Amino acid sequence: MLTAEFHPFTVVPGLRRLFLDYCSSAAAARPFYASLPSDEHWRTRPPVPAHWPQFVQLLAEQNQTPSPAAAAALEALRGGAGVIVTGQQVGLFGGPLFTPFKAATALARARQATAAGAPHAAIFWLATEDHDFAEINHVVFPARRELRTLTYATAPETSQPVGGIVLDDSITPLVEQAGELLGASDAMDALAAAWRPGHTFAEAFRQFYAKAFAAQGLLVLDAAGREFHCMGAPVLRAALERADELHQALVGRNRELEEAGYHAQVAVEPQSSLLFLIDERTGARLALKRHPASAQEPDGLWQAGRQRFSTADLLGILASEPERISPSALLRPIFQDYLLSTSAIIGGPAEVAYYAQSAVLYERILGRVTPALARFSATLVEPAIGELLRRHGLTLEKVFGESTALLAHGLAAQAIPEEGKQRLAAAGAALEAELGPLTGWMKSLDAGLGRSAETAASKMRYQMSRLRRLAANFQLQREARLGRDAEAISQAIYPGGGLQERLHGAAYYFARHGFELAEEITAEAGNPRPGHTALWL
């Protein structure tokens, strides 16, 4: 049984102001979003599109032999239930911990809407068209006193969509290494069954998460194929035929964000477009760049690699080979929500930020903007680490933002014998008691003398701080366990100077705590307040 401890997002270092204002439902963020966390109209299902029966049939074909809960979700969709969607790149062995947090949030929101009388199901969108292999080819698992990185090294020859990469025999020793780190468990069995030679990254990822969230009824979708691109062709066609209009809308939105004191998550360059082209010969995913209209080409030109195309050329490809036209990060949510008729989309801090940009595309292409909801964010505190935190009187807020060295120094300062603490405190207090009146008196005599006095006083305060550091460093040398404790806490709670959810592989926690963890995080992910939760396992 876990214990949840809620914290506002302000305890997390490095989050951008736009995301924080969105989470607090600040008035300044409202112009950029269809819905803020304080709103509830995300539960309203958009109109059922004409392609819905075909879409649900294709979804069912990808979710063959569903669990009872997934079969019930499919049946609800056939009856017109709404969709809460989330998604992620298809990372090795299930990717980082925030991946199941996304799935859990979509499931929790679908449950809430259904309980309120608006039936919904959760769909996990596999970002299989992404071509950043270096982002998905590795996973990090905690090991004894270290973090171990497992890497699938067989890179494709071109920057092709990662979902279609077929696993070769080199995956087998990686699975064996994962087994040594994770130990025997249902999760390890599921991982080994999914990640095997002959499977694609997409198939392996889908199979693992369908198993992990079988009891909750998660449906998994790969929309990279011809049928889905044909179904979503109106969105891709708009991005071709109205490229200049949509580009200017994005430029204008970026300007509005910057004028409001925010940042633009995705840069919009003069020649950038909303589309990629899959090369028919190599399979590489190439950015389509836009060249302005000219006397010779009144509709402008497009360029992918060294090849140039007219708009008519690309419309021809869309008609005959729609799977070769691929949406960018800013267009993908619109393409996705056209297919799914989405009620709400779940995203992390960066995604919520770029939804503020995509909103202008939603308005112009779909005529509506899908509400965005922040995913569940958490740190899982295992029993041994929880004991260390309690022993040293540490909270998440005290650990976040601290390097291992600074954390160790803090533990050592706490461990200084009481007599030493009292003497250091007394010396510091006495110094401050004398310096204040002295520098004030010297300043009253002469301004220049006062400035010199402040400089000298600052140096004296520095030396006092140095005495504290010397005492703490001596204590750290005497008690080596303090350094080991600091290292263990850092690797578990704030590894590599970042949140645990962004680095640790999710499979590690499923292996240690069972697939029952999926239900536990789904239950916690229903909290309507955006924030960061410590889950004490």
Question: What are these model-derived regions, one by one?
Answer:
Residues L97-F98, F133-V139, G232-L236, Q357:
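Short acidic, glycine/serine/threonine-rich loops at helix termini
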Residues M1-T65, G87:
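N-terminal leader/transition segments
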Residues V140-D169:
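A glycine-rich helix N-cap at a beta->alpha junction
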Residues P31, F208, A212-F309, D313, ...:
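Long, compositionally biased intrinsically disordered regions
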